[in-house]
Amino acid sequence: MREIVHIQGGQCGNQIGAKFWEVISDEHGIDPTGTYHGDSDLQLERINVYYNEATGGRYVPRAILMDLEPGTMDSVRAGPFGQLFRPDNFVFGQTGAGNNWAKGHYTEGAELIDSVLDVVRKEAEGCDCLQGFQITHSLGGGTGSGMGTLLISKVREEYPDRIMETFSVVPSPKVSDTVVEPYNATLSVHQLVENADECMVIDNEALYDICFRTLKLTTPTYGDLNHLVSAAMSGVTCCLRFPGQLNSDLRKLAVNLIPFPRLHFFMIGFAPLTSRGSQQYRALTVPELTQQMFDAKNMMCAADPRHGRYLTASALFRGRMSTKEVDEQMLNVQNKNSSYFVEWIPNNIKSSICDIPPKGLKMAVTFVGNSTAIQEMFKRVAEQFTAMFRRKAFLHWYTGEGMDEMEFTEAESNMNDLVSEYQQYQDATAEEEGEFEEEEGEN
């Protein structure tokens, strides 16, 4: 079967990861002790995508938890599903990375990385046919960003042909948790561009907005935000885990979404999102789901898709629905909003349908879009980076760990290149390409 090994790093990654395992376990009927209490054979049919079956019919997540300080791990272990994980798969240091990318990537993290890789190997060996890795981490801190990207490059070296998918929480525009976020994020993006296959970009501010506006929560907690992310994460892999009419997997997703290798940063969304009160008053239809799915307010990262154009998009539907209706809706969206899709990639929305909806819903959809508008986010981080780097503020924390200023300059220009690549394809039209070819032919 096509297994996925899940890795979570740093505080943010571990909190999102813990929530994700609650959601997945719920979908597959696994209780906090790893015992199956489900009501349908479908839950067990492909449970080995995310779980290993241990002795006595116990299901153990293929999850690796890493951090440079023990705090978050202890709270995961004490949390509702803490006893689910294999104790050997908790790998942690004692020092912490102190929000310093260099500590995570070069010093503290580098000391711990070998023990993480041992666990990764052990998990990979327990798979029949490993599909790939998914990593949850944030880019603003030290461990998830520094050590997370170090792990990605090491795993990349060892498993070059497996898909590497990340769920990366990027710094928010207005809310900043750490002053040095722009540094950590830029250094991380520099790595992700080269070593990851698909990055789902998430940010807290967009998640807060969804909680306020759509879910009508007055005081959303990180738990609520992480639940949103988990819903989308589970949607991305539901086709691997449940039977469907039109299947998709991580590799198909990558092939359909990435027109150029560097442009693999996606926005994700999830529908239906309704406030708890109004849930039972409406029956969902495919058109309604499609409408909400493409709504800018539904995106889990603070970039407005209306400011750019979609290169490609993928709609992963869940529930019983007609394939014909899904296809019609997808065509409909592209025809009505043609200016928001590049015309040089015809039919650029891929859809897939998985028969089993999430718990408590009749149908749902996860949206993954490759939009040029994501450059807004990179631009924002780059501006903050430049403002500090020009004055060499806070640099001594990084150079003290053995980093060189050159690395910062490289990361900065790599990020600026990425922004201009997105801009170039946003402006490109179908006709121009033809003209270029003719000119070349004449010479």
UniProtKB/Swiss-Prot annotation:
Tell me its cofactors: Mg(2+)
InterPro entries in the record: Beta-tubulin_BS, Beta_tubulin, Tub_FtsZ_C, Tubulin, Tubulin/FtsZ-like_C, Tubulin/FtsZ_2-layer-sand-dom, Tubulin/FtsZ_GTPase_sf, Tubulin_C
Location of the protein in the cell: Cytoplasm, Cytoskeleton
Residue spans of biased composition, Acidic residues class:
429-443
User: Which keywords accompany this UniProt record?
Assistant: Cytoplasm, Cytoskeleton, GTP-binding, Magnesium, Metal-binding, Microtubule, Nucleotide-binding
Q: Where does Mg(2+) bind?
A: E69
Annotated GO biological processes are: microtubule-based process
State the post-translational modifications: Some glutamate residues at the C-terminus are either polyglutamylated or polyglycylated. These 2 modifications occur exclusively on glutamate residues and result in either polyglutamate or polyglycine chains on the gamma-carboxyl group. Both modifications can coexist on the same protein on adjacent residues, and lowering polyglycylation levels increases polyglutamylation, and reciprocally. The precise function of such modifications is still unclear but they regulate the assembly and dynamics of axonemal microtubules.
Q: Identify the residues that bind GTP.
A: Q11, E69, S138, G142, T143, G144, N204, N226
**GO cellular-component terms in the record?**
cytoplasm; microtubule
Q: Does the keyword Coiled coil apply?
A: no
SMART domains (UniProt xref): Tubulin, Tubulin_C
Q: Which residue ranges does the record annotate as region Disordered?
A: 424-443
Fetch the Pfam families from UniProt: Tubulin, Tubulin_C
The UniProt GO MF terms for this protein read: GTP binding; GTPase activity; metal ion binding; structural constituent of cytoskeleton
Q: Which SUPFAM superfamilies match?
A: Tubulin C-terminal domain-like, Tubulin nucleotide-binding domain-like
Q: How does it assemble?
A: Dimer of alpha and beta chains. A typical microtubule is a hollow water-filled tube with an outer diameter of 25 nm and an inner diameter of 15 nM. Alpha-beta heterodimers associate head-to-tail to form protofilaments running lengthwise along the microtubule wall with the beta-tubulin subunit facing the microtubule plus end conferring a structural polarity. Microtubules usually have 13 protofilaments but different protofilament numbers can be found in some organisms and specialized cells.
Q: What else is known?
A: The sequences of the two genes coding for beta-tubulin are identical.
Q: What does this protein do?
A: Tubulin is the major constituent of microtubules, a cylinder consisting of laterally associated linear protofilaments composed of alpha- and beta-tubulin heterodimers. Microtubules grow by the addition of GTP-tubulin dimers to the microtubule end, where a stabilizing cap forms. Below the cap, tubulin dimers are in GDP-bound state, owing to GTPase activity of alpha-tubulin.
Q: Which family does it belong to?
A: Belongs to the tubulin family.
Q: What is this protein called?
A: Tubulin beta chain
